[in-house]
Amino acid sequence: MIGINQLDLDRNLIMVMIDIENLHLISFNFIEELYAMNLDAVNPELESKINDLVCETYNKPFLEQEKLLKEAFELIPKPVTQWAHPTTMVTIALFELYYKNQKYEQAKEWLSIALSVADLGPTNAGTYLLAGIFYYDLENYDEAYKYFDIAYNDAGYYPFSIEDKKYWQFYKQRKDELNPKKKTKK
């Protein structure tokens, strides 16, 4: 790797890396987004404070968890959709809190925010898998399949491997129904 050449320093920053060994040219548009995806790269103290609030919720009653998680969410710089982390961490924690307590409308609101930042980070299969599980458990099978399919296309079977097998079985069966293998008769 010979290094990075900065071609433009405004918001439309383009950086080019040239890998001489493999003769690849890789360009990144909006390179600042690579850093903005993770608050820790920009403001590690704030990231740590948010992490501490989320950790503090462990084994607390519902109302205390809710208060701490919403406090953590308010600390995330606006717009929250620019940060893969900690937005995903906090919104998934709020989603799970409401979901476990059968407050499905609130759970859905927080899941929606988590999904809005899912593609900012390097790994997003877990967020999509949670969305699939949520909709499956609410018997909204079309939405469940949609999110399971995104998770599968992103990470294969692995995210399903740590969940109840019914989700994988549902996904596989629906996928086979929607994409039947063509059999030719001779």
Locations of the language-model features?
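Alpha-helical adaptor scaffolds
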Residues: 77-121
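Boundary/linker segments of alpha-helical solenoid repeat arrays
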Residues: 80-83, 120-126, 153-166
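Residue-level signature for tetratricopeptide repeat
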Residues: 55-59, 97, 134
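TPR/TPR-like (Sel1-like) alpha-helical repeat modules
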Residues: 140-158
